[in-house]
Each structure stands twice: as structure tokens, then as C-alpha cells.
Amino acid sequence: MKPFIKAIAGIANQDVERVALLAQVAELAGVEALDVSAHVDCVKTARALFKGTLFASAVSADALLKAIEAGADVAELGNYDDMYENGEFITASEVMALAEASLKALAGKAPLCVTIPGHLSRDVQVEMLHALADKGVAMIQTEGAIRLLKDNRVQALNADEKASLSLENARFLASEGRLPIMVASGISAQNVDLAMQTGAIAVGIGKAFNALDSQKAMRQELEACQVAMNQVLSAIA
């Protein structure tokens, strides 16, 4: 699998006009993949504007199947930011159950990428990696999580802390060599090089891209991410 950048519109972003804008920018920037909400209207809008690999994200097997039927190429389970915002922490068993339901619903129609919750211990994440690989999951995405549960207290993480945690999780999981790893959470042009050095095959760019105000700034961020990735790949070639 060739290393790639994935632009992330956001799992909670169901504003079709905004999704259309982000899809247009991603296409102009030349990134290989775009990730949108599995909401059918968002998927159809993005599919009409973006020629690369289209990921659709949800925390529902039914929503993922509908997204694939609407034109998405890859179903992605996660992320879980909405849950963390509400102080909810999805468990490993809950993710495994959702993954099994998603694989059953998809029935081979499309590959499944699963986000492993960033708040779980490394040992649990590794167990999940192997179990998901055995079940037929195609790719893992790491996250930093916007909140952690520590000593029974909810602890908020800033962007740098999210990125650091996601990078650490990616390095740990990539070293297992079971599945391709994608790094997301707090990743931007400033740390794409660190993301690639973890052994990951792909990098997800979210708020560093989708929270910007102008199309020019969004495109420049994605292009800078690609330049940074290519520099790392050239250095290790």
C-alpha cells in the first residue's frame, strides 16, 4: 500500500455545503483520500466532487453500509470524539461488537477501517489490533482522544497532547506489523514527518484543514502535508 494523506471533513459535520467545499479543496490539493460523515447526503455530495478514495465514518454498522451503497469506498468505524465530549468512554468490547456488526453488514462490499480508542491501555490496544486483523478488518486508525479517564476523573487534552498520544499509539501498533496504520488526531503539516516516522502508512488531517476559514489556506495546509510526507519518504528511500 502506497503512503497517503487523508483529508478529514469530520464525522459530526453533516453540513452538505461545507462538505462540498472541503471535498473541492481536497480534490484541488490532490490528496489521495477524503473522509466524510457516513450521512448519505454527505457521501453523495463528496463522491460527486472528489475522485480519490472516499472514506465514510460512523459509529453504526447500518450507517456505514448505507454510506458504501451511496458511493463511499471505505467504511470507517469511529472516531469517538462526540462520546468523549459527553464524558463517555467507549470500551474495547463495544468497539469489537461494532466492528463485527459492521463486517457482517458490509459482507465484503468494502474494506473496514477501525479507530482504536486512544484512551485504552497499550496492552488492550494491541489485543484489539490482533483481534480485528483476525476478523478481517483492513486498516487501523489511531487517535489521541480529546479526553482521557484518569483516576476516575475526566482529563481534557489539548491539541499537542492529542497528537503526542496518537503518535505514541501508532508507533506501538505499527511495530506489531499486523495491519496498515493511519495516524489521526492533532496532525498537521508541522508534525506529518513525526507521523510517518511511527511506521504508519497514512496520515489523517482534520482540524488543521477543516477548521480553516479560506479555501486557499485549506489547500495550502493539505499541500504542505503532502510535501512533508514526500520529504520523509525520500529520506528513507
Give the ranges of each region predicted by the language model.
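Conserved N-terminal beta1-alpha1 strand-loop-helix module at the mouth
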Residues: 1-72, 129-137, 217-230
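Hydrophobic faces of well-ordered beta-strands that scaffold small-molecule active sites
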Residues: 3-9, 34-36, 54-58, 75-77, ...
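Catalytic cores of alpha/beta
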Residues: 21-22, 59-73, 120-135, 175-203
